[in-house]
Amino acid sequence: GETKNQNGFEILDEVIGWCKEAGIYVILDMHDAPGGQTGDNIDDSYAYPWLMENAENQKQFIEIWTRIAKKYANNTTILGYDLLNEPIAHYFKDDLPRLNKNLEKLYKECTLAIRKVDKNHIIMLGGAQWNGNFSFFTDWKYDDKMMFTCHRYWSGTDKQSIQDFIDFRDKVNLPMYMGETGENTDEWVEKFRITLEENNIGWTYWPYKKMVQKSGMMYIPKPENWDLIVEYTKKDRSDLGKVRDARPNQELVKKAMLDLLENMKFKNCVKIEGYTKALGMKP
């Protein structure tokens, strides 16, 4: 999460400015919440969604969103706020009923806090268990600019594969938005995209660019010596001595990271035409 001593707003302002110039709407999404909201590698947590248990983490979470909302309350480039990315992984089976209940309570508290400073923007609530479970929601009438957001990977491509999302959307009579999907073949991407559109579910595919060919619209060329970093992550680092022994040459690692930053620039990426066509866009 962005804190008072960081330059997060400067970075956000720059990116939002680029999007405004390009005519692109922005959805602000919190991927790494205080304490961790998921309990897996995507939220930099300690392998548990402590945000759902810790009052201080929850206070900071709400404060961050309130500061963001206050700053951007009248910004028309921002479409809305996606409060949490993929909260509460499915691993914690015995704890899920309690964690999911705490999530709904936190969503409501955060939404009401945001509305004190921003009555304009859409607020998006993701389902629990990888944005896939909406069955625990009991209240969706406390805000009139609210919608839900789902994620789905590695499923079928027909209507049945999203029927649970359709059923929940129709039950609550609020929009459902597919905030993440993809990571599949061009054929799968096209069929699933068409199914979403036929069922009036908006979408964004993940990711835009990646260092894996055919996983996005753009491919980042792999830097020289990048495999040194990859191999280091696979080695035994169970004590500090093994960490030191496994550590690769730091100059080569530094060069690989700097080369990555250079390769990530649009002009140096490779366009994946098949994936782009599958999304119904011109390559």
Model-predicted segments: where are they?
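An active-site-proximal structural segment forming one wall of the substrate-binding cleft
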Residues: 1-83, 106-115
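Residue-identity detector for glutamine
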Residues: 2, 6, 37, 58-60, ...
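Alpha-helix capping and helix-coil boundary motifs
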Residues: 3-7, 158, 185, 239
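Intrinsic-disorder/low-complexity, polar/charged segments
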Residues: 54, 183-185, 249-250, 254
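Extracellular glycoside hydrolase catalytic/binding regions
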Residues: 62-210, 215-233
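Extended, alpha-helix-rich binding/interface surfaces that flank or overlap catalytic cores
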Residues: 195, 199-283
